[in-house]
Amino acid sequence: MSIYTTEITSDKILSDNPLHHRLLSAYVFAKKYISGDVLELGCGEGRGIDIILKRSKSFTAIDKISEVTERLSRKYPNEKFISSSFPPLKNIENESFDTLISFQVIEHIKNDKLFIKEIHRILKPGGKALISTPNISMTLTRNPWHVREYTSQQLFDLASRNFKKIIMKGIYGNDKIKKYYDDNKKSVMKFKRLDVFNLEKYLPNFLYKIPYEFLNRMNRNKLHANDNSLVTSITTNDYSLENDNPKNLDLFLILEK
């Protein structure tokens, strides 16, 4: 059984297709940076594992959902999967990995300073860390699953506490993606106009998750129904890795120890 909410994007639900390929594109763009012993923090359903394995010497993944790591262990018996929350990275020795990948995770981490510090600790000298996260400049509504979101400057400043070699890039979309984004924005604004009590702003996260999940799924289904050909035709080829730009959908941080 797969674990799907609108926060854990499906590769099977058609209305999730644009976001699935946006998330998958990060792994495609990461390929040229991947080498040696690789650790993925927050592997989820294993969206990018097949891409990583083609470039890695060994692969270890950590995720807090034990059902996920157990299923991935059966699917990839030669790789190592650990069920654990983080940070800290328990039982991971200093300078253990050549490459670290953590996509769409840091926005969920309460102690993001410790998270970056731990990444620096477990990387080998010359090792690289690749981190993606939503660009708050392009976020349409508050996400109750996220502790925080970042501007590129905020993420750069956070990383610079422990890393000196930092490259900030971002995941950008072509005209098809812009059309989907604009349609999504119009739809979200209609929903927000109905929020006469401003629940988006004031409702605690644990309560806001309930209407957010329902309305987010409804919205994705609506976008799919209104333009099936657009939603289902989007692939990783419609995304690109670009230099830092406030219009990038996601931030893509490259760190070297």
Q: At which residue positions do the language-model features occur?
A:
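Conserved N-terminal segment of class I S-adenosyl-L-methionine
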Residues: 1-93, 99-103, 115-116, 152, ...
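Conserved beta-strand signature within the Rossmann-like core of class I S-adenosyl-L-methionine
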Residues: 127-133
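Conserved S-adenosyl-L-methionine
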Residues: 163-175
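A short His-aromatic
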Residues: 104-108
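A C-terminal cap/extension of S-adenosyl-L-methionine-dependent methyltransferases
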Residues: 173-257
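Acceptor-substrate binding/catalytic loop of class I
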Residues: 139-157
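A short glycine-rich, Lys/Arg-flanked "PGG" loop and its adjoining helix->strand segment in the class I
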Residues: 113-125
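Short "lid" loop at the C-terminus of a central beta-strand within the Rossmann-like core
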Residues: 134-139, 149, 172-175
